[in-house]
Each structure stands twice: as structure tokens, then as C-alpha cells.
Swiss-Prot record:
<keyword id="KW-0804">Transcription</keyword>
<dbReference type="Pfam" id="PF00156">
    <property type="entry name" value="Pribosyltran"/>
</dbReference>
<keyword id="KW-0808">Transferase</keyword>
<comment type="function">
    <text>Regulates the transcription of the pyrimidine nucleotide (pyr) operon in response to exogenous pyrimidines.</text>
</comment>
<keyword id="KW-0328">Glycosyltransferase</keyword>
<dbReference type="InterPro" id="IPR029057">
    <property type="entry name" value="PRTase-like"/>
</dbReference>
<dbReference type="InterPro" id="IPR023050">
    <property type="entry name" value="PyrR"/>
</dbReference>
<dbReference type="GO" id="GO:0006355">
    <property type="term" value="P:regulation of DNA-templated transcription"/>
</dbReference>
<dbReference type="InterPro" id="IPR050137">
    <property type="entry name" value="PyrR_bifunctional"/>
</dbReference>
<protein>
    <recommendedName>
        <fullName>Bifunctional protein PyrR</fullName>
        <ecNumber>2.4.2.9</ecNumber>
    </recommendedName>
</protein>
<feature type="short sequence motif" description="PRPP-binding">
    <location>
        <begin position="90"/>
        <end position="102"/>
    </location>
</feature>
<keyword id="KW-0805">Transcription regulation</keyword>
<dbReference type="GO" id="GO:0004845">
    <property type="term" value="F:uracil phosphoribosyltransferase activity"/>
</dbReference>
<comment type="similarity">
    <text>Belongs to the purine/pyrimidine phosphoribosyltransferase family. PyrR subfamily.</text>
</comment>
<comment type="function">
    <text>Also displays a weak uracil phosphoribosyltransferase activity which is not physiologically significant.</text>
</comment>
<dbReference type="InterPro" id="IPR000836">
    <property type="entry name" value="PRibTrfase_dom"/>
</dbReference>
Length: 170
């Protein structure tokens, strides 16, 4: 199975997001990308939408429930939300939805900043491997991978997807 080209997924995602927001009567939502791939996808979506609003960024490293097992990422960055969260309609963007743990961590962090009116989840890929009941409202493509496979977004320009096969533990 070949991986999709993000540049081919993004125009449809932008159209689907526009329709999703209009259906709910949401105007001028605030956009938040999750480090790092989610920021790249959010920037591409904002460009496709012709939107020049500031982009908020989250690094959820300290909010992950598995960092004691996996360790802290060596490049923890500060989150930056250049707007109020309280009462805002947010569009939360990530590159790959797998277990749902990154999204759970992002929601926890967002609620530490305030109580949004709503959160719309947008993901470039849904790997259909959820451990938590989290589903994207807008998705570029859904894929099913083997247990030893992962997908990583590389970029920022051009955006591309790489498949990785995990090596067995020694």
C-alpha cells in the first residue's frame, strides 16, 4: 500500500472543514496545531482556506500519559496561544491520529488555558488504531497499518509521509 500525498489531501480537507464549520454556524474559529506535524498541516490548511489568522501551537510533551514509559521528547517547546481560549471555537490540527493519546493530551492542555466553546478535530491521517474514543471531524485519509508499522509526516515543505517499520525489541 502506498501512502497518500499530503498536497493532494489538503484541498479536500479544507473544503470539508469549511463545510463542517458552516454546518455548525461557526465563524472565525481559532486554529491550534500540535507540534510538529500538526503545525505544518494547520499552516497548509490556513493557506488553502485563505485565512491569515494567527496559529496557536501546542507541545503536549508534559501532558502525555505515557511519557514516564517513553521518556520526555528531547526537544520540548513552549506552547503558544496568541488568543483567548475561553468561549472560542477551536480547530485542533494534528498530522496522524493513532492511539488518541496525543489528542487527549492536547485537550487537557487547552482546558488548562480556558474553556473553549467547541473543538473541531482535524487530522491528515487516521490510522484506525485508537485506544481512546477520539475521532476526527475532518480527516484526509484513513489507513490501517500492521502492528509494527508507523507513519511520520516530514516537512515542512514539501509535506510528505514516510512509512516506518519498528524493529523487534532485543
Amino acid at each position: 500500500m502506498s501512502l497518500p500525498n499530503p498536497a493532494e489531501l489538503l484541498p479536500r480537507m479544507a473544503s470539508d472543514l469549511r463545510a463542517h464549520l458552516a454546518e455548525r454556524g461557526i465563524e472565525r474559529p481559532r486554529y491550534v496545531g500540535i507540534h510538529t506535524g500538526g503545525i505544518w498541516v494547520a499552516e497548509a490548511l490556513l493557506k488553502a482556506l485563505g485565512n491569515e489568522e494567527p496559529l496557536g501551537t501546542l507541545d503536549v510533551s508534559f501532558y502525555r500519559d505515557d511519557f514516564t514509559r517513553n521518556g520526555l521528547h528531547p526537544q520540548v517547546r513552549p506552547s503558544a496561544l496568541p488568543f483567548e481560549i475561553d468561549g472560542q471555537h477551536l480547530v485542533l490540527v494534528d498530522d496522524v491520529l493513532m492511539s488518541g493519546r496525543t489528542i487527549r493530551a492536547a485537550l487537557n492542555e487547552l482546558f488548562d488555558y480556558g474553556r473553549p466553546a467547541s473543538v473541531t478535530l482535524v487530522c491528515l491521517l487516521d490510522l484506525n488504531a485508537r485506544e481512546l474514543p477520539i475521532r476526527p471531524d475532518v480527516v484526509g485519509q484513513t489507513l490501517s497499518l500492521g502492528r509494527d508499522e508507523r507513519v511520520k509526516l516530514v516537512g515542512p515543505a514539501p509535506l510528505a509521509l514516510e512509512r516506518k517499520v519498528l524493529s523487534p525489541a532485543s
